[in-house]
Amino acid sequence: EKLIYVVNWRKVFPNARLIVPIDNTSLTKTFITAAEVLPLSRDEVSAKIFASYLFEFDVATYLFDLLTPAQADDDYDIQQHLLPAGNGFCGMAYSDVFVALKKQYNAILIGVSSIGPDGEYQLSKNPADNRLIESNDYLILILSGGSSNRLNEALQASIG
């Protein structure tokens, strides 16, 4: 039922990026190929978090903190920031931006999403040191609530 709805919705909004909750994980590939969506299974996500709690308790605790929005200055969050043209980080190597963000804002750069040849954003997790940061890249960061506001002002960037 969801697949039919999503396929029909896709006809009206062909360029929309969709995340669809699914109950039947055997339909994951079907959703990806037929409807061009990112299927999200609550059971798969829950199982991975549960396994972390069993075998890597500290990792699971940290993950839980990252999955919830930062409420206080010492809470941590994962955010993405769109880097506008003319920002000082544009044209710099990933490793240099990583070090600068850590030293200046106590933020950890964990990935970059940039426009690929097909015009869609492509996520690079922990890219090579020499990868150049460009305008309109999304910087994927782990940072505290206290660092977030300062970083927004300094980057002249928007979240999301």
Give the ranges of each region predicted by the language model.
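Cytosolic regulatory regions of ion transport systems
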Residues: 1-160
